Amino acid sequence: APPAVPAHPPRRVHCEGRDAPRAGFRLVDTTPYSRCANLSAGGPGAPRCFLSYRRAAERGHDALGVTDICLVMPGKGESTPHTFSRVERSLNSGTWGPALFLCYKLSMAKGNTLVYEAGLLCRYPEEDSASFPLPDSVPVFCLPMGATIESWPSGTKYPLPVFSTFVLTGASGDKVYGAAIQFHEPFPPERLSEKQRLRLGLLSVVDRRPVGGRSVHSRKSICVLSHWPFFDVFRKFLMFIYRYSVSGPHVLPLEAHIAHFMHNVPFPSPQRPRILVQMSPYDSLLLCQPVSSPLPLSGASFVTLLQTVGAEHALTLLLAVLTEQKLLIHSLRPDVLTSVGEALVSMIFPLRWQCPYIPLCPLALCDVLSAPVPFVVGLHSSYFDLHEPPRDVIFVDLDTNSIFQSEERKLLSPRALPRRPCKVLLSSLHSLSQQLHESERGWG
């Protein structure tokens, strides 16, 4: 099995005589057949290079692991494969010979998991309002990877809740914004069938005897739906509800906090543009009136778009949306998909994107990628571990800052845009990107 390695820092290429051994990293200096594992493509006398890696914590859960590696030689026209990252150090440490780079793929290192279609457990209010009926598809958007039952080694630390956002578009074009957090709860093992116990590693395969040292958990989600994209406020509210539910006992029941937030908190207005909501002595929420802007209100984050794809790719994506391409954005971080997707369809204002738009698409609905119409769809990158995507789709990898297009189609180029406006826009994007980089460095 591939080593489970955290996403940061990446694995390294270690050259003898040049690099000092790093604490916590292991050196792969021999093959499984005890031969030298030198990766250097240099000639005689060139320093030997070896792969070094660091394993994740033994009891880590939902960690990213290296599931595939490959070598690319740019001098022969080879490029980094889709969903792969490249170690920016050539394996050819000598003077002669072409550059050779190691590429690796990160995927969720999960095992002993049962996946089911998500369903609704409870809701508030319990009855639909005439103007805002609860969409039936909400559960699968709250858990886009499915509802799971998982078996962990005893003593495993609970992973932190995962925040995500999504957008549901009605037939009239009205948007409903969703904010959700996913978390884990203990699951009673006695509710499992023998077949489920076997698949979760709770029974031995040979004699069906119980396997000790494991615990069972289920993945659940809580969600807020609104016609307003107050994602930051909703994230803080959901995290408060989650922490409140797993701690206690408390004087006020959990339902009292939910009812207060839903019914008693006024919407910001010109007379009261800021509403401070005190959830507890230590938790408060600040709702602000949306800024007046010619742009329609949305959940777009142009900062996130520029940080993840850069100036040149942002311009290419603008062209892709203007020319109504089939566009798939994907990431291992579900919290960035909606903000980037909203930015893509918002930056063509005053034009409107009229084609299918699902910025966070559940894996169960991925058949939309075969639609014969343009679309903007966001997916978790694990989609590529399970499916072969259509060849007429443009893929935008937000984790590796790369765009992949089929070789059978003419590649999109910003040169198709009017020359002078394109030059001005690109210069502005570069300036903004530089400012963001400097501000990040200042905060870091």
Predicted region positions:
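Peripheral, non-catalytic segments of secretory and membrane proteins
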Residues: 1-110
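UDENN/dDENN subdomains and adjacent acidic, S/T/P-rich linkers in DENN-containing trafficking regulators
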Residues: 97-444
